């Protein structure tokens, strides 16, 4: 480069360039970090030169690097590490890792005059020209710009002031020239200290550059080129911009008077234009930068510190420093740069605009200027605004980190365009300014129309002009609404001065691309949409605002909800800032909830009389809604935490958790000591935690463990410390007592109070939670989950405030001004206010909450406050939680805590890139809180406990990566159904986990496997722990929460699936609070909690609303939300609503599976999932805090509830209700045994839920719309399948109700198995599943899944799904499950759930241990199901063993049938054989796959269910798509759970499985059905049968390993396979397709539906002619609940593939049409598969689609690779 530069220079200036090397040591400064931005890198070469150097792209004014580094300096080394040919991210990382000091070696280009003694008068300009060229590249590369700038910047810097003013390159040069008569000389001034001054006063003059021939001036002869213009028409021109000068001349009205001074030396004329332009650009850019910095400096600074990493992920343009801007709000900086530059460079228009944008784009502002200059010369075209959104860096973060990011480059280009034609217009305002504005902060404010005859029109303003400044107010970074209001607010008659620039082409592009505003906001109040186009939201949700003047009117903003993975989910209308502030003020003024919070508030006031009362009030306050200091809308950007974020733990064992972390991991965690408050403060035991204390801990590279109140958390968020807030969700009061007795026997805190406080905390402050972990009192799996959650949160991106917090956090928090925190400035020092609970809490009592909450601090009396405070002490304000709305704000809580505005979501989900979207976090947070709140409302203490219990189960199951989420979700799910149900679930889960897998194991599992494991464990544990006891006890614990709900809403429960109702009831109780959200919180909290964890993992599901499905969904997603929210909103009656008014679990799951938020919707499902922790749902929770999990949880709850219920009733999940509330359970059972199967299938759906959560885009769309789109897409894809589907469409509910025998024929292993398998391959979106009353033992087994085995299997299989599928459900089981499914297909999944419960009945360890092979092969396990399903169904509360058996057989059957479809289900299904026992006739020896299933039915089945449900569910969680799709599908579908079995497995499975199936045939599997349930709405992808098929295959291998021969055989298609399903209730066959294929392959498609199966050559063994069929069904019982009145429909069809058990040597591609989203990448898809022939929801397993090589989501269809049916 130096050579090139030298050449250029010598060519132009007789000078050469040399590289000087300098080494500087930078000290990280609080607000600035190192104060530099870097660009370039191997992966981000200069867009023109291709240079890959790391270049200083920006040096912050007043920052540590000012005076030491310059723009365009090339970074040679950082702390001794070479920066040559490294990637941008690496360079950023090195800077970030450098701690407080960084030793940076740079190369700086220096121009040397060869011929002339002067260093480089001309050469300087030349060089600069060269540099400028580089800069030009830079705008895009970001690196080049940096590099160029640095060379010239040092030069330009010295003269930056003058340059800024110098409007044109000449004037700038001229000042230089004037100082040097001969030629320009390069002068470099380096400050030795920051406050040192250059001592220059610069000015710019306008000179005559050229006189055209034959012009007036030429003829006059008095003006010569090079003359300096001193006056124009009497106006002094010094420091006047060229634009202003031009305007003056244009306004001369035919007579131009000028005063000029002759420059004999013509110095200005001799200054090279290019070089000069660059210089001036640099200088002005510099100035612009400073101005911009002032605007966005904070962000910029912060970004500099931390952004490098971020920017890296973001986009090359963002560069580390730029990333700062961009993360912060690149738009803003860019605008700022633009406007300041333009102002400064009025004389040189080109430089003005570009620098600004460039600055945004590239950290270095100078570069931008240069770029502008060059662009101006080279191409005046403005980059299209659109590119801004699609910047290189953005891919990492789904959303553009900040609109400005994209804009910057545009700005640069625009500058080039704008520069030449600036105009200064002055006029007096009449009645109006007479302008119509377009654009926004992302692209600039443009004149869209000028009123004729208005002063503005007369002065020359016209359409297409960009307004750069009005009355000295910069318009470059202003949102359109502000611009309009500013103009409107100008007093009539006041003189208006508008600096504009003609940019007609840019304007045209802006109008065509419909861009304008683009910035991110986090909400800090709850809002219910007021119109169908509105978006409802909870606290902590993040939106991208794209139009602040929607429809050209003030009052509404067009915003896009940001969901999981920071993806844009749905767009709609939200109130504008002013209205939002009004609404928020009302919310904070009035009591949030109808009774509880307000009553509590007054109660606290009354209690203050005594110390005890004070303590109590403090405790209560901790749970009170936080009154935040945040504005209603907080501008946020996505950033990485550049420091170890403080950790706040809330929950009944928060004190134990803090001490355990600090004791066992002293080098990672340290408890922040509290200091006494000022004198007289009190009684409160603890004082406050000083921010300084926190900072000291952070400086030691440790997480500060804070014992603070939720208010303190909010304040920390406000101060931008963005603590990681983990909520340990208790399973029950008894669970809390048990855990505390075990963990801290000396503690005197009251378990009841701790539990109640936790419940309230979750209800009111869930939005503060970044993660929720469900506690299982049976084990300590929560600990591993806690550590994993903290690690994940730390690694996630965080939504942080765009600017510094206004004012330091007051109170006792002593925070420094650098409240930006490292998040804002990675290198910045933290300033934290004391986050001490007392200190931060709104109330004094709350303030000491941390202390009070601590066990030690409180006695029994104080127990309450003590226990709760830890939970409530710090709630993740950043985490969006539905609950929040309900009890979010209490009058009590005077001062708003620092809501983790910036980081709710991000923090919550560690796995997310940096952090979840606010909405995600909200979802996570809200899920926990809602969970609590539902419990709280119905039975605040009981409910909370229940939920907590669920959490525990989840925790145990999958503590590590997804434990917090999974735990939370599971717990939530469990809790939601009913206070006790959650309890039960937790226990089951706890039992299962400890006995079978140590929490650590579970934790360390892959996210999906973990989840599955967790679920497995959960299921198993309960069963293992105490089958009978569990049921009896669980019904109470698990059902307790439900019972309260059920009791309160017995009728409702009856209407809805019990678990669902429990959730609903939960919510209902809450519903007393006017806010449906509250309601939702009550029940959704669980779901949300679960979801929130999932959200953590999946950015998309972050939607708080989604999480709070009932309420938020409604407002948020009109179509889906309507249905979801419809029932969810009134949790009292929600359950029935979602379920097509079916009380059955199946229906319920569906409801909970609502497209919008599958998991949230079906609170029951979430609960179900957790409750039936043995079920896939349980795994789903762990699987991650994905939306699926959410869903899963609810269904789980449902399912889990059933375990207790099943105890009381074998027939349905309803038994859960029965257990908790017998009547509801019974109605459910009575309603439809089939439903139970459905419920079971939903268990797999929980994973789907997670996915759904993940796919917020789905939610925004109405289900109907999605369905239509899906169908359209489907039509092409599923043509062939359709025929088969019609014939084979299965009806899980029907199947369930029907005797499995009818469906499955034991004697017919192959044909029926095939069919069964095919049916099993039912790919359907997960839907809540009703846990079936099946033997807990069976359930346990079904849930039982060796997490390790499962995980390993997955790896072997290319996808965990495959492995899990195999392990969790053998083919034999699948058929059984299938048949059972007709009778009770859901059983399979339900079984897993029940497995939890049953596992209580039988040792969890046993189930877990045998999870894969044992389970599969465990005849005993299979045997428990033997009791006839019908009898089971009929039995309201059969003995545990009986129930267990019943469920088992049913579940096994159903699961076996749908294995292919839902891998998770597959696993569960595999256990189908047990159900087959109950129906030997039904079970027929399955084909290859069936035998394994049959073989393992007893144990295998539960194991399978567990594995599938848990691990696969987790996987399924990935898709955000589920969120929008009907919950059921999503919950069941695992995005990638497709259990794609590697060919080896297929080979073994094909023949062997068939053989094995006959073995299993001892327990005839129900007719296998593979359900490919693609919901039209959200989960078509997840439904991919391919996934299910793989699942089957995968499962088989596990089971099959022991008894499968590999000889290939054609799998017979049972005649009933194609027809049977139709008979089942709830199955409506839309289309069927069948054909005979050989090794040559082919395509089987259904034209009507667009479903197709593409069989590759070699998929079928040589010499075999295999009949293959599929049925496209609409299953009313199996599918997730949809609100048909609201037009909700499934996005994808439900596809049952057959013959069941058929394995392929090569995966076949199942294509399901869908139109869930406008853009394929905007949605996440949840795929469900089931090995159950009936496709009962219980057997549905979530398939993890996202990222799975076996699945592809296209615009119109979802492709899933399936290796078996």
Curated annotation (Swiss-Prot):
Membrane topology, as annotated: Peripheral membrane protein
Main localization, broad class: membrane
Domain Guanylate kinase-like, chain residue ranges per copy: 690-791
Biased composition (Acidic residues): 123-136
Localisation: Cell membrane; Cell junction, Tight junction; Cell junction; Cell junction, Gap junction
GO molecular-function term, one example from the UniProt record: transmembrane transporter binding
Cellular-component GO terms for this entry: adherens junction; apical junction complex; apical part of cell; apical plasma membrane; apicolateral plasma membrane; basolateral plasma membrane; bicellular tight junction; cell junction
Domain PDZ: 23-110, 186-264, 421-502
Segments of skewed composition (Low complexity): 893-906, 1388-1399
Biased segments, Basic residues type: 102-112
Ranges for domain ZU5: 1631-1765
Domain called SH3: residue spans: 516-584
Bias (Polar residues): 325-338, 1442-1468, 1509-1519
UniProt-annotated stretches for the region Disordered: 102-189, 296-363, 825-941, 1023-1042, 1092-1585
Basic and acidic residues bias spans: 149-175, 299-308, 879-892, 1106-1124, 1268-1285, 1335-1346, 1401-1418, 1535-1544
SMART domains linked: GuKc, PDZ, ZU5
Residue numbers spanned by region Occludin (OCLN)-binding region: 633-876
Functional description taken from the UniProt entry: TjpP1, Tjp2, and Tjp3 are closely related scaffolding proteins that link tight junction (TJ) transmembrane proteins such as claudins, junctional adhesion molecules, and occludin to the actin cytoskeleton. The tight junction acts to limit movement of substances through the paracellular space and as a boundary between the compositionally distinct apical and basolateral plasma membrane domains of epithelial and endothelial cells. Necessary for lumenogenesis, and particularly efficient epithelial polarization and barrier formation.
Entry's family note: Belongs to the MAGUK family.
Domain comment in the entry: The 244-aa domain between residues 633 and 876 is the primary occludin (Ocln)-binding site and is required for stable association with the tight junction.
Name listed for the protein in its UniProt record: Tight junction protein ZO-1
Species, as recorded: Rattus norvegicus
Species lineage: Eukaryota, Metazoa, Chordata, Craniata, Vertebrata
């Amino acid at each position: 480069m130096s050579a090139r530069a030298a050449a250029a220079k010598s060519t132009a200036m007789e000078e050469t360039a040399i590289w000087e090397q300098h080494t500087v040591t930078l000290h990280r400064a609080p607000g600035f970090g190192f104060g530099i931005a870097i660009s370039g890198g191997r992966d981000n070469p200069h867009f023109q030169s291709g240079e890959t150097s790391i270049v200083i792209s920006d040096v912050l004014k007043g920052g540590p690097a000012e005076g030491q580094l310059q723009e365009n300096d090339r970074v040679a080394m950082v702390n001794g590490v070479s920066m040559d040919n490294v990637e941008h991210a690496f360079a950023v990382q090195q800077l970030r890792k450098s701690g407080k000091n960084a030793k940076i070696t740079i190369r700086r280009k220096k121009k040397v005059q060869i011929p002339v003694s002067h260093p480089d008068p001309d050469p300087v300009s030349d060089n600069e020209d060269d540099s400028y060229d580089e800069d030009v590249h830079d705008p895009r590369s970001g690196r080049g710009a940096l590099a160029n700038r640095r060379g010239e910047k040092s030069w330009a810097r010295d003269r930056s002031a003058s340059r800024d003013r110098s409007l044109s390159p000449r004037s700038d040069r001229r000042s230089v020239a004037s100082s040097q008569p001969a030629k320009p000389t390069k002068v470099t001034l380096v400050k030795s200290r920051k406050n040192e001054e250059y001592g220059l006063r610069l000015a710019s003059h306008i000179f005559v550059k050229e006189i055209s021939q034959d012009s007036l001036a030429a003829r006059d002869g008095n003006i010569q080129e090079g003359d300096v213009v001193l006056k124009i028409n009497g106006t002094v021109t010094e420091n006047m911009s060229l634009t202003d000068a031009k305007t003056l001349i244009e306004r001369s009205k035919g007579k131009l008077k000028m005063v000029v001074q002759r420059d004999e030396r013509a110095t200005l004329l001799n200054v090279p234009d290019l070089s000069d332009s660059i210089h001036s650009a640099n200088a002005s850019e510099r100035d612009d930068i400073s101005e911009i910095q002032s605007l966005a400096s904070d962000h910029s600074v912060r970004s500099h510190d931390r952004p490098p990493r971020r920017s890296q992920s973001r986009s090359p343009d963002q560069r580390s420093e730029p990333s700062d801007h961009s993360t912060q709000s690149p738009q803003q900086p860019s605008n700022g740069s633009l406007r300041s530059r333009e102002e400064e460079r009025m004389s040189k228009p080109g430089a003005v605009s570009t620098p600004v944008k460039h600055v945004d784009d590239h950290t270095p502002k100078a570069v931008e200027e240069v770029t502008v200059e060059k662009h101006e010369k080279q191409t005046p075209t403005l980059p299209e605004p659109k590119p801004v959104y699609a910047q290189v860096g953005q891919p990492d973060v789904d959303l553009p980190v900040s609109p400005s990011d994209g804009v910057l480059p545009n700005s640069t280009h625009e500058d080039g365009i704008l520069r030449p034609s600036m105009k200064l217009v002055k006029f007096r305002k009449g009645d109006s300014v007479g302008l119509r504005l377009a654009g926004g902060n992302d692209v600039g404010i443009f004149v869209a129309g000028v009123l004729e005859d208005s002063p503005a029109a007369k002065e020359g303003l016209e359409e297409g002009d960009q307004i750069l400044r009005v009355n000295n107010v910069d318009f470059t970074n202003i949102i359109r609404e502000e611009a309009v209001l500013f103009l409107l607010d100008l007093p009539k008659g006041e003189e208006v001065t508008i600096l504009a620039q003609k940019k007609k082409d840019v304007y045209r592009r802006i109008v065509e691309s419909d861009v304008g505003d683009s910035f991110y906001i986090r909400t800090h109040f709850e809002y219910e949409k007021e119109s169908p186009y509105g978006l409802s939201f909870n606290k902590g949700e993040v939106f991208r605002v794209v139009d602040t003047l929607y429809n050209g009117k003030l009052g509404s903003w067009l915003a896009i909800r940001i969901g999981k993975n920071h993806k844009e989910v749905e767009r709609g209308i939200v109130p504008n800032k002013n209205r939002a502030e009004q609404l928020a003020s009302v919310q904070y003024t009035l009591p949030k909830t109808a009774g509880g919070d307000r009553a509590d508030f007054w109660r606290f006031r009354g209690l203050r009389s005594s110390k005890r009362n004070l303590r109590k009030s403090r405790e209560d306050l901790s749970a009170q809604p936080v009154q935040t200091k945040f504005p209603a809308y907080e501008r946020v950007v996505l950033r990485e935490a550049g420091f170890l974020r403080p950790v706040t733990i809330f929950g009944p064992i928060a004190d134990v958790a803090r001490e355990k972390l600090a004791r066992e991991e002293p080098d990672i965690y340290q408890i922040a000591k509290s200091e006494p408050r000022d004198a007289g403060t009190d009684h409160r035991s603890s004082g406050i935690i000083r921010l300084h204390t926190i900072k000291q801990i952070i400086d030691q590279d440790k997480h500060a463990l804070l014992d603070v109140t939720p208010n303190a958390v909010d304040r920390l968020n406000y101060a931008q410390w963005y603590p990681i807030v983990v909520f340990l969700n208790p399973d029950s009061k008894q669970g809390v007592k048990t855990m505390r007795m075990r963990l801290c026997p000396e503690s005197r805190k009251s378990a009841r109070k701790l539990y109640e406080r936790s419940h309230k905390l979750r209800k009111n402050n869930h939005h503060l939670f970044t993660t929720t972990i469900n506690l299982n009192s049976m084990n300590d799996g929560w600990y591993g989950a806690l550590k994993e959650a903290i690690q994940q949160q730390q690694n996630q991106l965080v939504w942080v405030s765009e600017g510094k917090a206004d004012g330091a956090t007051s109170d006792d928090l002593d925070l420094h001004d650098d409240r930006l925190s490292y998040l804002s400035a990675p290198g910045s020092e933290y300033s934290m206010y004391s986050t001490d609970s007392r200190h931060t809490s709104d109330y004094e009592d709350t303030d000491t909450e941390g202390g009070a909450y601590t066990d030690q601090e409180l006695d029994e009396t104080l127990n309450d406050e003590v226990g709760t405070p830890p939970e409530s002490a710090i709630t993740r304000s950043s985490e969006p939680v539905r609950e929040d709305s309900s009890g979010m704000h209490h009058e009590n809580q005077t001062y708003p805590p620092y809501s983790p505005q910036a980081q709710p979501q991000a923090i919550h989900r560690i796995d997310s890139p940096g952090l979840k979207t606010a909405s995600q976090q909200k979802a996570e947070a809200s899920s926990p809180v809602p969970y609590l709140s539902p419990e709280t409302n119905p039975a605040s203490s009981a409910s909370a406990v229940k939920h907590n219990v669920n959490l525990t189960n989840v925790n145990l199951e999958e503590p590590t990566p997804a434990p917090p989420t999974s735990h939370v979700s599971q717990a939530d799910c469990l809790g939601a159904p009913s206070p006790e149900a959650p309890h039960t679930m937790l226990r089951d889960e706890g039992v299962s986990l400890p006995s079978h897998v140590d929490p650590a194991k579970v934790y360390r599992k892959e996210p999906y496997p973990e989840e599955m494991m967790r679920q497995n464990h959960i299921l198993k544990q309960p069963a293992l722990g105490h089958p009978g006891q569990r049921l009896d006890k669980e019904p109470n614990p698990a059902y307790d929460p439900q019972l309260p709900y059920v009791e309160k809403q017995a009728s409702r429960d009856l209407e809805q699936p019990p678990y669902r109702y429990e959730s609903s009831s939960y919510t209902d109780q809450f519903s007393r609070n006017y806010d449906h959200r509250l309601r939702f919180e009550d029940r959704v909290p669980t779901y949300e909690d679960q979801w929130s964890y999932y959200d953590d993992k999946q950015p998309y599901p972050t939607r708080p609303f989604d999480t709070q499905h009932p309420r938020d969904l409604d407002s948020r997603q009109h179509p889906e939300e309507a249905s979801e929210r419809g029932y969810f909103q009134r949790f009292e009656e929600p359950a029935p609503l979602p379920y097509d008014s079916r009380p059955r679990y199946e229906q319920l799951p569906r409801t909970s599976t609502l497209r919008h938020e599958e998991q949230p919707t079906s609170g029951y499902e979430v609960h179900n999932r957790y409750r039936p922790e043995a079920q896939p749902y349980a795994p789903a929770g762990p699987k991650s805090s994905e939306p699926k999990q959410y869903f899963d949880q609810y269904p789980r709850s449902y399912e889990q509830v059933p375990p207790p219920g099943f105890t009381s009733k074998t027939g349905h999940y309803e038994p859960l209700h029965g257990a908790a509330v017998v009547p509801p359970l019974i109605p459910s059972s009575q309603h439809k045994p089939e439903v139970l199967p459905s419920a079971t299938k939903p268990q797999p759906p929980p994973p789907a839920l997670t996915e759904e959560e993940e796919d917020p885009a789905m939610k925004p769309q109405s289900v109907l719309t999605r369905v239509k789109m899906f169908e359209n897409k489907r039509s092409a894809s599923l043509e062939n399948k359709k025929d088969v589907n019609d014939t084979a469409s299965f009806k899980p509910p029907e199947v369930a109700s029907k005797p499995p025998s009818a469906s499955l024929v034991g004697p017919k292993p192959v044909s029926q198995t095939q069919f069964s398998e095919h049916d099993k391959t039912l790919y359907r979106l997960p839907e809540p599943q009703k846990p079936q009353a099946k033997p807990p033992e069976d359930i346990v087994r079904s849930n039982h899944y060796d997490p390790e085995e499962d995980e390993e299997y997955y790896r072997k299989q290319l996808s965990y799904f495959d492995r899990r599928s195999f392990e969790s459900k053998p083919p034999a089981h699948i058929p059984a499950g299938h048949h059972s499914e007709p009778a009770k297909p859901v059983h399979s999944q339900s079984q897993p759930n029940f497995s939890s419960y049953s596992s209580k009945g039988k040792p969890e360890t046993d189930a877990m241990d045998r999870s894969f092979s044992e389970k599969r092969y465990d005849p005993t396990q299979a045997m428990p199901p033997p009791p006839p399903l019908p009898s089971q169904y009929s039995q309201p509360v059969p003995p545990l063993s009986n129930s267990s058996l019943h469920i088992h057989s049913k579940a096994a059957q159903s699961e076996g049938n749908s294995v292919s479809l839902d891998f998770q289900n597959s696993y569960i299904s595999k256990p189908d054989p047990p159900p087959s026992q109950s129906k030997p006739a039904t079970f027929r020896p399955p084909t290859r796959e069936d035998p394994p299933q049959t073989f393992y039915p007893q144990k295998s089945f539960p194991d399978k269910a567990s594995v599938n449900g848990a691990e696969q569910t987790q996987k399924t969680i990935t898709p955000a798509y589920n969120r929008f799709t009907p919950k059921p599908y999503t919950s069941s579908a695992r995005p990638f759970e497709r259990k794609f079995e590697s060919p080896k497995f297929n080979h073994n499975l094909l023949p062997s499985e068939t053989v094995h199936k006959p073995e299993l045939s001892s327990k005839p599997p129900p007719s296998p059905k593979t359900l490919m349930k693609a919901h039209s709405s959200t989960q078509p992808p997840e439904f991919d049968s391919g996934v299910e098929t793989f699942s089957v295959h995968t499962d088989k291998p596990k089971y099959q390993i022991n008894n499968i021969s590999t000889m290939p055989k054609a799998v017979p298609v049972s005649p009933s396979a194609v027809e049977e399903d139709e008979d089942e209730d709830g199955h409506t066959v839309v289309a069927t397709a069948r054909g005979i294929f050989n090794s040559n392959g082919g395509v089987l498609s259904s034209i009507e539906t667009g479903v197709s199966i593409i069989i590759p050559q070699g998929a079928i063994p040589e010499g075999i002619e295999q009949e293959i069929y599929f049925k496209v069904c609409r299953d009313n019982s199996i599918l997730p609940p949809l609100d048909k009145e609201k037009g909700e429909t499934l996005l994808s069809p439900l596809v049952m593939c057959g013959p069941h058990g058929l394995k392929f040597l090569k995966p076949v591609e199942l294509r399901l049409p869908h139109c869930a989203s406008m853009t394929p990448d905007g949605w996440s898809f949840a795929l469900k598969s089931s090995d159950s022939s009936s496709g009962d929801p219980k057997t549905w397993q979530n398939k993890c689609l996202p990222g799975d090589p076996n699945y592809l989501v296209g615009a119109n269809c979802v492709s899933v690779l399936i290796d078996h049916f």
